[in-house]
């Protein structure tokens, strides 16, 4: 079994070529033009030829279509009849809105969250700081509250928990 049986490889190649060519080549369908037979007519019709119709030399000359078109002497704006324009009536506008709508800061982690400023400052009255890199939030009772620079501010601890932030504990610090 050391030698390749070359005759089997050749037979497989030949069989593959025969099957491929057999399946790829389809029988040719010849389409033949069938003429309608005219009963009782033995006269042969002439084959169609392309002929140019003869031009009679004595015919009258037609005018070009552009010669019949009239040129407008007035502008289009002058041709449109204008009815009397109604006088412009002023629209009443309220001077000041009845109630001021508070501006809500952009909430990156849902309602009750706000982005921190460049210096880490947040909205007034919001005491919960958050770090988006560690997903931890800090309350004023935590010992690391003051040195922590906030990336996100939360209105309360429930808002931070809804945003899937976890509270800071001594056990969460890596040592």
From Swiss-Prot:
Family in the record: Belongs to the ArfC membrane protein family.
Assigned keywords, A-Z: Cell membrane, Membrane, Transmembrane, Transmembrane helix
Note: Expression in M.smegmatis leads to reduced survival capacity of human macrophage-like THP-1 cells and increase of the release of nitrogen monoxide (NO), and increase of the release of lactate dehydrogenase (LDH) and NO from mouse bone marrow macrophage line ANA-1 cells.
Spans traversing the lipid bilayer: 4-26
Taxonomic lineage of the native organism: Bacteria, Bacillati, Actinomycetota, Actinomycetes, Mycobacteriales
Protein name per Swiss-Prot or TrEMBL: Uncharacterized membrane protein ArfC
Subcellular location: Cell membrane
Primary localisation category: membrane
A Gene Ontology cellular-component term: plasma membrane
